[in-house]
Amino acid sequence: MHYYVLFTFLTLDLAPVALSLSTCSALDMDQFMRKRIEAIRGQILSKLKLNSPPEDYPEPGEVSQDVISIYNSTRDLLQEKANERATSCERERSEDEYYAKEVYKIDMLPYYTSENVIPPSYTTPYFRIVRFDVSSMEKNASNLVKAEFRVFRLMNTKARVSEQRIELYQILKSKDLASPTQRYIDSKVVKTRAEGEWLSFDVTEAVNEWLHHKDRNLGFKISLHCPCCTFIPSNNYIIPNKSEELETRFAGIDDAYMYAGGDSKSKTGRKKHTGRTPHLLLMLLPSYRLESQQSSRRKKRALDAAYCFRNVQDNCCLRPLYIDFKKDLGWKWIHEPKGYNANFCAGACPYLWSSDTQHSRVLSLYNTINPEASASPCCVSQDLDSLTILYYIGNKPKIEQLSNMIVKSCKCS
């Protein structure tokens, strides 16, 4: 029984050490940087589910301004969120995941407010707009842990195509005619004629922005992935193409269209799907729990750029590493950015967990379970940021957000 408990403890507590690229073993800095570069090469291809780099792609000058505009807005959003986390000393993710959250459901704002009003005719075959009132949650904005948008897909037996890729966008407040009016969030491939199902999208960043900036709450847009249609950013219009209509139907949005033949057009469809209205699920950390955490938390020195880059450190610290896609990886297929600050963690962890302070039976058992791993602490990444890239598969532009690509701080573990 004792061995079972020890094995469970060691497996859970030390698994990140074995999986991390760290400085447990002696490595000179040049060798470690080369290993880091090769790890990034494999990481990017793996995240994009590519076996090898794409061979066919357009020249940089051939990329349209609309594609560049969407890339820039997505990249800027990530940077804004990273800056907000840095200035507000965001709670550690591990604490957010440990404590129980309160869940709130917010239904979509209705298209019509009266039961006696016939809903407007079906006039937007290319996209749907969904809006929410989250003002009641504004006082708890800093407690938001996660927000999820859920919409129920209806079975559409009259659909001309059996499968479509739908995309979710956050509608932006336009500053001028040249600025983007939507920001890509996520996409899903759905079966239009299949039995109905719930679709879920992570919209934490968008809802967090709404809670802090009420005037930016313009809702979400559900549209079709449609490269053959022309999108006009200045007025949010799509040039019609009959072969690319959105034929995916949603409960609470398309009820009137789906059941237009029923009696009382304004009521029948809506009542049929009671409980399946598009909604947000907000998960918040209770205020009393957040206050308790903040009052008892000790301030720790962050091994980040602000500390490590201005101090010469032999011990565990963040080390700068800029990856030039063309020079370091020999890649020309990533159009934006040209490179990025990947960084890495390196250095000794001499005081946290020395081998002579551990019980010999624990060390012996751990070495038996994982003989190639180190029983000493390793310098590993703690906080990581995402990277947004623009690349092409053939002539098709793709904008992807790659998680955990930029090391921001380190720790001994």
From Swiss-Prot:
Signal sequence coordinates: 1-19
GO cellular component: extracellular space
Keyword Signal: yes
GO annotation, biological process: anatomical structure morphogenesis; positive regulation of cell division; regulation of cell population proliferation; tissue development; transforming growth factor beta receptor signaling pathway
Disulphide bonds in the chain: 308-317, 316-379, 345-410, 349-412
PROSITE patterns reported in the protein's UniProt record: TGF_BETA_1, TGF_BETA_2
Sorted UniProt keywords: Cleavage on pair of basic residues, Disulfide bond, Extracellular matrix, Glycoprotein, Growth factor, Mitogen, Secreted, Signal
Glycosylation site list: 72, 140, 241
SUPFAM superfamilies listed in its UniProt record: Cystine-knot cytokines
Source taxon at top rank: Eukaryota
Single GO MF annotation: transforming growth factor beta receptor binding
Keyword Secreted set for record: yes
Pfam families xrefs: TGF_beta (PF00019), TGFb_propeptide (PF00688)
UniProt cross-references to PANTHER family, sorted A to Z: TGF-BETA FAMILY, TRANSFORMING GROWTH FACTOR BETA-2 PROPROTEIN
Family, as annotated: Belongs to the TGF-beta family.
Protein name in UniProt: Transforming growth factor beta-2 proprotein
Gene responsible for this protein: tgfb2
